[in-house]
C-alpha cells in the first residue's frame, strides 16, 4: 500500500484501481473532435516539420484512446459531471478568446468562483486526463489526484494555465484559420537538487485554445517515486539526463508550454 502512489497495473482502472468492467478513455473527447473537424479528414502527427502525419479513421479511432484502462463507474457516473462542465467551460473560454479577451478571465464569472462545484468540476476533468497520461506511461497511480478526479475529495491540487496554442498560431499564419486539436502527453520536470520528479504536467488543445495543467510535488513524493516505483523513476530520470545533454530551444519549450 503506497502513501502517495499505488503501483501501475495494466488491468486496473487508472483512477480507482478496480479491475472490473474496464473501458477506454479518449485523449481528446470524441464530441470535441466532431465539433472541430465535422466530417473532414483528420491527420495525426507532431506537426514539427520533421515527422509525417498519418490519416486518422475518425473521432472514435483507437489512435485517440489512452491504452490505460478505466472502469465503467469512473468513466461514467464518477466523472460525468466534470466532463459536462468542461464542455460548458471550454465554450466560454473559446468565446472569450474569439472576442480578444483574456481566456483566463472566465474565472471571473460567478459560476467559477474558487471552490464552487462548477469550478472544482473543471479541474477534476484535467485531473482525470493527467492521471490517464501517467498510466499511459506505466506510472504509478497518484492517489490524491485520482481521488479528486472522481469526486472523493474537494481539495484541488491541479494548476491550470490557458493560452493560445503556438502550433495552431504558426499554421494560422501560413494557412489561415484551420481545424486543430492536440495533447501534450506527459512531462515530468525534475528537481535539480533532489534529482527526483517535481511535477506531472500535460496539456490539451482544442482549436486555438491550449490548456496546460499540472500537479506539484513535495519532496516526499519524489522520494516515494524513487524508492517504491524505481522503473518509472528511472525512465523519467533518463529523459531528464537526455534533456540536460540536449537542451530544448526556446521555441521548443514554448511549443511544449514549459
Locate the predicted segments by residue:
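An N-terminal structural lobe/cap that precedes and organizes the functional/catalytic core
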Residues: 1-81
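Catalytic cores of phosphodiester-bond-cleaving enzymes
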Residues: 2, 6, 58-140
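Intrinsically disordered, low-complexity boundary segments flanking structured domains
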Residues: 14-16, 109-113, 189-191, 198-200
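Generic structural signal of hydrophobic/aromatic residues within well-ordered alpha-helices
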Residues: 40-43, 74, 82, 86-93, ...
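Short alpha-helix boundary/capping motifs
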Residues: 41, 98-100, 154
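Short C-terminal domain-edge/linker segments immediately following a structured domain
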Residues: 45, 100-105, 243-247
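Low-complexity, polar-biased intrinsically disordered regions enriched in Pro/Ser/Thr/Gly
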Residues: 47-57, 102-109, 190-193
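C-terminal, charged low-complexity interaction regions
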Residues: 135-258
